[in-house]
């Protein structure tokens, strides 16, 4: 069984245990905060938008530096992040909906709930906890599930980041006409990463969609390798959690977009 399959089985177990029902009962409702739409930054900013991630660990990185997460979010906003991503998976990524609930209150930026969503109730919990964006991973959803969950999210005034890794997944994503697609440079089955994977998939981009490169971005040089593919933004976690100088590092990632290749 791959790590991805293991995670999805775990999510199904949580659904059976009414884990998400309990979260809806105990979380403070932070779902009506007015935030700028991520799509506006992606469409109108002349530099790459950065979704700055809060994470504690992952299957490929067992432990990241322990930070004051409240201060980390404030610094992300201070130094130019366009959105905040917060992992909510407890077992594999060390996150929680309680953390999302707490941190979403201290920022006016768009907030992404980073999790493995396979059911509508997970979207309900994400919104209640304060998310304005949810992640939909094409690899773990059927076409019907993808369409249903995307519609459910947008009908509840949430943005959706539709994540793909292969050309086939990109084709499936394009069928629902999403506003934002994330190209994951990490193969979720093997957790191997290649930042140049973005360039391969962006050859098949469409003009009515914005594209974000996710995973494997550790330096400004990594961004320079992919900016000419006409990406609109980046999702960066590990490198931002590790750096000791956010004031220099985060702004250095916001390169000028390639506006001439559409």
From Swiss-Prot:
It is an enzyme of class 4 (lyase). Signal peptide: none annotated. It catalyses: 1-(2-carboxyphenylamino)-1-deoxy-D-ribulose 5-phosphate + H(+) = (1S,2R)-1-C-(indol-3-yl)glycerol 3-phosphate + CO2 + H2O. One of its GO terms (biological process) is L-tryptophan biosynthetic process. Gene3D superfamilies: Aldolase class I. Pathway: Amino-acid biosynthesis; L-tryptophan biosynthesis; L-tryptophan from chorismate: step 4/5. The keyword Lyase applies. Disulfide bonds: none annotated. It comes from the Bacteria. InterPro entries: Aldolase_TIM (IPR013785), Indole-3-glycerol_P_synth (IPR045186), Indole-3-glycerol_P_synth_dom (IPR013798), Indole-3-GlycerolPSynthase_CS (IPR001468), RibuloseP-bd_barrel (IPR011060). Keywords: Amino-acid biosynthesis, Aromatic amino acid biosynthesis, Decarboxylase, Lyase, Tryptophan biosynthesis. Pfam families: IGPS. Its EC number is 4.1.1.48. GO terms for molecular function: indole-3-glycerol-phosphate synthase activity; phosphoribosylanthranilate isomerase activity. Belongs to the TrpC family. This is Indole-3-glycerol phosphate synthase. It comes from Staphylococcus epidermidis (strain ATCC 35984 / DSM 28319 / BCRC 17069 / CCUG 31568 / BM 3577 / RP62A).
């Amino acid at each position: 069984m791959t790590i991805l399959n293991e995670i999805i089985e775990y999510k199904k177990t949580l659904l059976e245990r009414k884990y998400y029902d309990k979260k809806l009962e105990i979380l403070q409702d932070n779902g009506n905060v007015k935030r700028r739409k991520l799509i506006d930054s992606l469409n109108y900013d002349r530099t790459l938008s950065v979704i700055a991630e809060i994470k504690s660990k992952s299957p490929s990185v067992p432990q990241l530096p322990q930070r004051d997460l409240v201060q980390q979010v404030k610094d992300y906003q201070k130094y130019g992040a366009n959105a905040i991503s917060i992992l909510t998976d407890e077992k594999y990524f060390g996150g929680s909906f309680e953390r999302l609930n707490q941190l979403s209150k201290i920022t006016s930026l768009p907030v992404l709930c980073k999790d493995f969503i396979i059911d509508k109730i997970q979207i309900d919990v994400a919104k209640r906890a304060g998310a304005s964006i949810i992640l939909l991973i094409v690899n773990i959803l059927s076409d019907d599930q993808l369409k249903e969950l995307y519609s459910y999210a947008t009908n509840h005034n949430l943005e959706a980041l539709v994540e793909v890794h292969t050309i086939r997944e990109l084709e499936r994503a394009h069928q629902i006409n999403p506003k934002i697609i994330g190209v994951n440079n990490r193969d979720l089955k093997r957790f191997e990463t290649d930042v140049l994977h973005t360039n391969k998939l962006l050859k098949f981009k469409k003009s009515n969609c914005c594209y974000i490169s996710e995973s494997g971005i550790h330096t400004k040089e990594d961004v320079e390798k992919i900016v000419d593919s006409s990406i609109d933004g980046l999702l960066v976690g590990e490198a931002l959690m590790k750096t000791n100088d956010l004031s220099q590092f985060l702004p250095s990632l916001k390169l000028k977009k390639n506006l001439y290749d559409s």
